[in-house]
């Protein structure tokens, strides 16, 4: 704020609301608040880098990601006479195994993709075949096209396996409640700009090339609207990253961050924005 009158343009600060799963960035864009934004930059804490280190990469950085749920409906019955029932548990099991082939047999091995079944529910009695059973999970790809292909095939496989096993299947991709995220793709120019500013501020050795990540990130919605760059910022230290420590990921209840990273991130955000305005005079 003390340098507000020196800015050669406008800087908007965006706290990412509902970033985890509910596509907050999509709704921020829908509000129109960022319609006049030329470029955008973002930071995300990362525990396996120390304070004072940032990392990113040009081009595709984080995966497109989505969720799915499916319910298989058969005919319940006594487990001792399975021929009088239509077993949805067998149908679910067949679908789980068939879905594994999407990555191993239908995805180019040089392209990253994930299909993980993380929810499996059936009956609640040892001697009863349930009327229905369900599964759910996540699927990811480093491209939006790859995600669309996986979505199409997941539906086809689930419906086909249900049919083979005489069941009906309902597939839900939760697109309103948990909107799929596109891939996070860093613009080459914006990545280069942010990298140069970070190197001048932190030193070249402290600005690293990050590996691609299969994590999903709603910054991707912003980066599709305006050229952008997204960076990881280290929040680890000798205690959280030391020989006796197990680095706790950001979604762990045991995650700990070194708050000395906060002023580093704030300063980097400010410097990246101010230097961009100085070079492009957006006033």
Tell what function each PLM region has.
Residues 1-2, 277:
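Structural signal for the C-terminal ends of transmembrane alpha-helices
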Residues 3-130, 217:
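Histidine/acidic-residue-rich, glycine-tolerant segments that coordinate divalent metal ions
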Residues 90-283:
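Metal-dependent amide/peptide-bond hydrolase catalytic core
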């Amino acid at each position: 704020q003390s340098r507000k009158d020196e800015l050669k343009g406008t800087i908007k600060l965006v706290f990412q609301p509902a970033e985890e799963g509910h596509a907050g960035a999509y709704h921020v864009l829908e509000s129109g608040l960022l319609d006049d934004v030329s470029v955008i930059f973002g930071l995300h804490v990362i525990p396996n880098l120390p304070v004072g280190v940032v990392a990113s990469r040009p081009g595709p950085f984080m995966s497109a990601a989505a969720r799915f749920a499916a319910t298989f409906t058969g005919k319940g019955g006594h487990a001792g006479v399975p021929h009088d029932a239509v077993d949805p548990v067998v149908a679910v099991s067949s679908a789980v195994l068939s879905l594994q082939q999407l990555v191993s047999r239908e995805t180019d091995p040089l392209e990253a993709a994930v299909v993980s079944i993380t929810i499996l529910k059936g009956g609640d009695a040892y001697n009863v075949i349930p009327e229905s059973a369900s599964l759910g999970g996540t699927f990811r790809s480093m491209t939006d096209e790859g995600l669309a292909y996986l979505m199409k095939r997941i539906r086809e496989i689930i419906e086909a396996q249900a049919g083979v096993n005489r069941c009906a299947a309902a597939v839900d991709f939760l697109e309103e409640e948990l909107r799929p995220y596109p891939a996070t793709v860093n613009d080459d120019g914006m990545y280069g700009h942010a990298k140069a500013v970070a190197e001048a501020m932190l030193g070249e050795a402290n600005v690293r090339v990050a590996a691609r990540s299969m994590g999903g990130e709603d910054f991707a919605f912003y980066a599709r609207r305006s050229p952008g760059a997204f960076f990881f910022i280290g929040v680890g230290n000798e205690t959280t990253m030391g020989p006796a420590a197990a680095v706790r990921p950001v979604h762990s209840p045991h995650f700990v961050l070194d708050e000395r990273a906060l002023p580093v991130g704030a300063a980097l955000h400010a410097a990246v924005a101010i230097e961009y305005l100085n070079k492009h005079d957006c006033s």
